[in-house]
């Protein structure tokens, strides 16, 4: 059974924070070679604080995917380290949240749910459902070209607000991720092409997907 739910930084058990930060080092340092700070095998930064909410995707209490949310009224990566990469951009603030540190732990996902799991799409849907449940207007994020392509293929309604170049001289995109009915339904339809799940269970928050493991 796959469960997706949200937890605030202040309410996160220490062992779960360690688990997230360890998985983030594997993803963002070891696999993607981002310029991130890692200490004792864990990746975290100044944006992991009381203003942060995490979506966790767990199978048998093991984290297999996660994403970080911060309300745009607080300091974010978009208004902080990413700001120099984009020019002449007017950001929507009121009612918007930033997403960052999106990951699916590929080895764990492959071992637990198989190669054709649509786990990324399920996490995309979780982001939409969470934002809708909390009354937000939309999600802002900065992504690489690879992630941009993955998002477009998912059927999610996304808008490019700006385009820049990272410190690695790679194209990056500042995106508005829609949380409209069509985005939700497109993501649900893609999941249903792979998994036999009652559609109504995918419209809720939190999300529980039974029978997804191998």
From Swiss-Prot:
Pfam families recorded: Autoind_synth (PF00765)
UniProt keyword Hydrolase present: no
Documented EC number(s): 2.3.1.184
Gene3D superfamilies registered for this protein in UniProt: 3.40.630.30
Catalytic activity annotation: a fatty acyl-[ACP] + S-adenosyl-L-methionine = an N-acyl-L-homoserine lactone + S-methyl-5'-thioadenosine + holo-[ACP] + H(+)
Superkingdom as given in the UniProt entry: Bacteria
General function of this protein: Required for the synthesis of autoinducer molecules such as OHHL (N-(3-oxohexanoyl)-L-homoserine lactone), and HHL (N-hexanoyl-L-homoserine lactone).
Protein name, per record: Acyl-homoserine-lactone synthase
UniProt organism field: Yersinia enterocolitica
Native organism taxonomy: Bacteria, Pseudomonadati, Pseudomonadota, Gammaproteobacteria, Enterobacterales
